[in-house]
Amino acid sequence: MTKITLSDLPLREELRGEHAYGAPQLNVDIRLNTNENPYPPSEALVADLVATVDKIATELNRYPERDAVELRDELAAYITKQTGVAVTRDNLWAANGSNEILQQLLQAFGGPGRTALGFQPSYSMHPILAKGTHTEFIAVSRGADFRIDMDVALEEIRAKQPDIVFVTTPNNPTGDVTSLDDVERIINVAPGIVIVDEAYAEFSPSPSATTLLEKYPTKLVVSRTMSKAFDFAGGRLGYFVANPAFIDAVMLVRLPYHLSALSQAAAIVALRHSADTLGTVEKLSVERVRVAARLEELGYAVVPSESNFVFFGDFSDQHAAWQAFLDRGVLIRDVGIAGHLRTTIGVPEENDAFLDAAAEIIKLNL
């Protein structure tokens, strides 16, 4: 077959020179770079999943339930229990990971001539998804401590009048939390909708923005995922919680039968076993405290985190430091922020290997 490159294709001009998103996938012993839950699913969950797939396999010649009604019922029950906010399936929408959730929201509320504003550094897919939907992305820098500078944030929202504002809490890659009071201040000055990205909410003791949904029915959407605390990254299931009108909106842009029968069934099984799965959250939180304390003891600067990862520095060359960890068999994440790296909290043995490497690397003055 004739070899060609992207430059030979009639690609959209704004995509030329861009790079595909993705964390490095390398064959190393210790992988702490993608914020997965390191604990495998329980034997009971696996057995339930196998039995469920066996049951539905004879129906795979048929399209799946178009609107994932049963799954949304289960998600609503989970959110009601986990946050204390009573919701029904009419408040829930599910898709293939929170990235598809965010993409659908941008398709419905962004687009040509519209803008989305976010506080950087934050989740790197926000500007990528904005570009893919022809939504102009406005980046507002966080403060030196990586927290949202509220005076700057409110001033920029008033000046730029964005159609969409992203607030990620706990924030990725820094791990800090934006208080509900500050979320409300943002909602009250934002002219359009505010998407609160709570991908890591289960790791945080802070209250969920879902508690504000009744107060701001036309402006607030809370996005979540089952990829992190739920130990379900391979299942690719994201969802949002909002007023039912928002579900009506994304139904205008969603693809038909977007969630496969297997995805729906697997997610329902995972929700049935949520008590077991989320039982690992406390273990990871304890490990996060231990890892952060040891890093500080070694002389690193650590950003306070309420998630399943730790953001730390200061390096003069963070990529050289990343390579030094990799040379020691530990894969962590260089997210492109000067002087800093991010490590996912793994099982104790993985964290020990990371900390042993960190103890050696601090001496290199990288």
Curated annotation (Swiss-Prot):
Listed InterPro entries: Aminotransferase_I/II_large, HisP_aminotrans, PyrdxlP-dep_Trfase, PyrdxlP-dep_Trfase_major, PyrdxlP-dep_Trfase_small
Full protein name: Histidinol-phosphate aminotransferase
Enzyme class: transferase
Any one GO biological process: L-histidine biosynthetic process
Annotated NCBIfam families: hisC, PRK03317.1
Natural source organism: Corynebacterium glutamicum (strain ATCC 13032 / DSM 20300 / JCM 1318 / BCRC 11384 / CCUG 27702 / LMG 3730 / NBRC 12168 / NCIMB 10025 / NRRL B-2784 / 534)
Family of the protein in this entry: Belongs to the class-II pyridoxal-phosphate-dependent aminotransferase family. Histidinol-phosphate aminotransferase subfamily.
Cofactor: pyridoxal 5'-phosphate
Keywords, sorted A to Z: Amino-acid biosynthesis, Aminotransferase, Histidine biosynthesis, Pyridoxal phosphate, Transferase
EC number: 2.6.1.9
Keyword Amino-acid biosynthesis listed: yes
PANTHER family (UniProt xref): HISTIDINOL-PHOSPHATE AMINOTRANSFERASE, HISTIDINOL-PHOSPHATE AMINOTRANSFERASE-RELATED
Catalytic activity line of the entry: L-histidinol phosphate + 2-oxoglutarate = 3-(imidazol-4-yl)-2-oxopropyl phosphate + L-glutamate
Modified residues annotated as N6-(pyridoxal phosphate)lysine in this record: 228
One GO MF term: histidinol-phosphate transaminase activity
The organism's place on the tree of life at top rank: Bacteria
Gene3D superfamilies membership: Aspartate Aminotransferase, domain 1, Type I PLP-dependent aspartate aminotransferase-like (Major domain)
Pathway: Amino-acid biosynthesis; L-histidine biosynthesis; L-histidine from 5-phospho-alpha-D-ribose 1-diphosphate: step 7/9
Quaternary data: Homodimer.
One Pfam family here: Aminotran_1_2
